[in-house]
Amino acid sequence: MRHLTLAALMLAAAPLGAVEFKWAGTTDPQTMDPHAVNSAPVLGFLNNVYEGLVRRGRDMGIEPSLAERWEPMEDGAGWRFFLRRGVTFQDGSTFDADDVVFSYERASSPESDTNSWFAPVSDVRKVDAYTVEILTTAPNPIFPDSIANWMIMDADWTVMSGAGRPDKENGNFATLNANGTGPFQVVSRQPGLTTVLEPHAGWWDTVEHTVTRAEFTPIQNSATAVAALLSGDVDMINPVPIQDAARVDERPEVTVLRGIEARVIMLGFAHESETLKFGADAGAPNPFRDVRVRQAVAHAVNVPAILRSIMRGAAEPASQLVSPAMRGFSDPNARRPEYDPAAARQLLADAGYPDGFSFGLKCPNNRYLNDEAVCQAVVGMLAQVGMRAQLDAMPVQNYWPELRADNFDMYLLGWSPGTFDAEHPIRFLAHTPDAEAKLGSWNFGGFSNGTIDAMLPMIQAEIDDNQRQSMLDDAAALLQDEMAYVPLYVQPLLWGMRSNVSLVQRPDNFFMLRWVRVE
């Protein structure tokens, strides 16, 4: 937190072969505040600007960042982190343990959308200027994995700018401005238009990129984004529309990079609401409180048809809240419900809805790949068994407030576990919402099961891999039996880039400028 001279900042040499790099995506990051909004567009973007104690490498493994090393504390009390010396924030101030303690207090505060990350944490204490101890409520063997996206802010800069706590609703100085330790710094921010970044000359790590200026532009119209890539107006777009991928890939000047994301797309329900809120049956008792109705939804949605016609074979069917590539995926529960309209109708009749019912389906139209088209298909499929959905699709900046205000009967959600572990969605999506315990913060529908709640701390504390997997298998089976959510598919990755660009495609869909090279 001590300030350095400008001359000291200029010691780092600029990368050789430097160029300007422009890229586009469908969603503009909602904020520059790393603790305000827990969403991939925000966290992915800000991982270029801010850093955590640990980070993910090219192979997605955890590696040192602002902490040079770490070790478990005695008796499983927590973890001790030894901080990197000589690190500076982009304004020249020095990073130390005070910034870590402050960033914990800020990111775990009730005002922060990331506070659920710290549910297993009881305290963070400074040992000395470059050592911190993070105390956990129980032994937590995967804790370092869980903080890869926890970004450290400069305590003095944040407080002096009046942004001591995040404010995702009204915004503050940190909403439009940033001061991280990462490889790039924000030099211009026009929400919804452009965000410009330049290399942080005082960055502590070895520079691998060749970028001297990077410019991000949100482009929601897919045809416009493709045209910008093909014309060379931008060097990279994410995503390439599925229907255009083959055509784009035929062009010699561009390349389509394909992969499978860690994100599962699913349908969620208003478990807690006593009545329906939308459609002709608004005010009537809520059918989704009955597991048979939720099972009917699972049998009514023709996932193979969605994969074939909308996702063009690029996605994979999902059976759980995590994909098969994630640690803790339950092999015994890998089978998803069959498409069976007759079974869906029978389940509805058994639940007392032989003629079906009307309700509302909320959906984003610029957050996930083909999200609105998927919701339109779901509406048609549900109608065939008597469930008449009123679709309300909207931009993501309007979508999250609607979900947090409980303005839905059913909704579409995508989830990518930040830890790449099956414990993650149990903590965020399946545990009973508990603001004080910082659990269930994305469980918008209020699903609640005492067994799941009791299993979570045992899963978090279990050191034996086999015992832990057995508990995760039990949790996956219970969530399937309850049909807490209806997993649909694992979302594909389709990035388009000019052929002279090399980069790393991460399965969490985070785009890292520090690996971009333009020849």
What would you call each of these model-derived segments?
Residues E316-D350, R367-D371:
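Structural transition elements
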Residues S116-A163:
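Surface-exposed binding/hinge segments that line
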